[in-house]
């Protein structure tokens, strides 16, 4: 009897399926598997960078402009389609799935600047970086110390930033800084966002950067940044009018802008896990031990079953949260839930897939170790798993005095 085997790459559920979504998912899948995966397998082990040709083709296919409005030459689609594309790209190389977020920073600029930069961003010709974390300020955004001092016609930035990925190649770095001294009694006050425009491949006067050596997330560099009287013009204070009127504007902007990135991280986590699952399904049917494929042994079959169920469950929640966001029912709590569950699942599934590969999985000859290394990061960036649990619990329980 011939059975139809479950495809680890299931179609979009009927409740969410449209011809447009099917088309963009297939477009991203074909590009990821045919163009990105072979390059990732070659470049990641040697810590090579994403080739400009890949970025150019991504721009031509519209992947940078998925959520950019059509009036700015984007596709004008939603979070759901963005998640579809991210999952497919992450299945091949998470760094490529991450770079599509770099165009979204153009939306944070003021209207006059959006009109200039968003059409470029939609084509992948203008990409940004985000400088928020500091040596002593990670999950606790309100504890940042980088200062913005008002001078004639602009601001001088001074301080340190950590974990600024793509800072060297970006056209603009959005910097989170304070325009007043840190006050423990008013921790959120005085936080602002500044758009520091720059030439790709260089740092402007007053800014220097040192690459951070990472165990994964290769394909681009992540920097520690030092600001030393780095000048930013007045019109590059993000949300100038509201920022002047509202002392908490910068903190609100930073915190409110995390829902879509967390859905994006869930999609990347699912893509990594799916890649590991697909590779494991193929490997266990080929690998022979004790005179038979290891896929014949129940322990192997149950591992595969658990992995597949985990991936499917997280994808289902991601679809729901993304669809709700597009319907104007965005929920910080549900975004935190899906980010937490998908990241934890991704580390677990990629680890199990590596286990099924045995010693071969612990080499750079196969991509499984890349999925495993990159999955570990999803529990840290865009809010750690612990912070996600804090957000969810705070929405379910009365406030705690430990705030």
Please report, for each region that a protein language model flagged, where it lies by residue.
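Glycine-rich phosphate/pyrophosphate-binding beta-alpha loops
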Residues: 162-168, 216-217, 260-261, 377-384
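Glycine-rich phosphate/cofactor-binding loops in nucleotide/flavin-utilizing enzymes
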Residues: 2-13, 84-85, 101, 247, ...
């Amino acid at each position: 009897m011939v059975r139809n085997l479950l495809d680890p790459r299931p179609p979009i559920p009927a409740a969410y399926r449209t011809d447009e979504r099917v088309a963009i998912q297939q477009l991203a899948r074909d590009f990821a598997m045919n163009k990105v995966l072979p390059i990732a397998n070659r470049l990641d082990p040697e810590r090579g960078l994403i080739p400009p040709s890949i970025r150019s083709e991504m721009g031509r296919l519209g992947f940078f402009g998925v959520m950019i409005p059509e009036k700015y030459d984007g596709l004008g689609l939603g979070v759901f389609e963005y998640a579809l594309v991210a999952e497919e790209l992450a299945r091949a190389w998470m760094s490529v799935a991450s770079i599509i977020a770099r165009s979204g920073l153009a939306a944070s600029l003021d209207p006059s600047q959006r009109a200039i930069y968003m059409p470029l961003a939609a084509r992948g010709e203008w990409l940004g970086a985000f400088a928020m974390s500091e040596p002593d300020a990670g999950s606790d955004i309100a504890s940042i110390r980088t200062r913005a001092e008002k001078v004639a016609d602009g601001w001088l930035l001074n301080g340190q930033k950590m974990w600024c990925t793509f800072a060297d190649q970006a056209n603009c770095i959005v910097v989170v800084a304070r325009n007043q001294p840190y006050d423990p009694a008013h921790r959120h006050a005085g936080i602002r966002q500044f758009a520091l425009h720059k030439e790709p491949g260089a740092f402007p006067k007053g800014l220097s950067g040192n690459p951070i050596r990472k165990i994964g997330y290769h394909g681009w560099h992540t920097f520690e940044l030092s600001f030393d009287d780095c000048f930013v013009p007045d019109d590059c204070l993000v949300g100038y009018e509201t920022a002047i009127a509202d002392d908490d504007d910068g903190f609100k902007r930073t915190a409110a802008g995390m829902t879509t990135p967390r859905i994006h991280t869930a999609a990347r986590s699912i893509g990594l896990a799916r890649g590991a699952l697909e590779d494991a399904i193929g490997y266990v049917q080929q690998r022979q031990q004790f005179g038979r494929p290891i896929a014949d042994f129940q322990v192997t079959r149950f591992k595969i079953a658990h992995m597949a169920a985990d991936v499917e469950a997280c994808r289902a929640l991601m679809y729901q949260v993304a669809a709700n966001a597009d319907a104007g029912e965005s929920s910080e709590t549900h975004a935190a839930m899906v980010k937490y569950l998908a990241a934890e699942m991704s580390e677990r599934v990629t680890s199990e897939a590596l286990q099924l590969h045995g010693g071969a999985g612990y080499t750079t000859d196969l991509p499984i170790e890349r999925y495993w290394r990159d999955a570990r990061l999803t529990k840290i960036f865009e809010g750690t798993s612990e912070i996600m649990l804090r957000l969810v619990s705070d929405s379910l329980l009365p406030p705690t005095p430990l705030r």
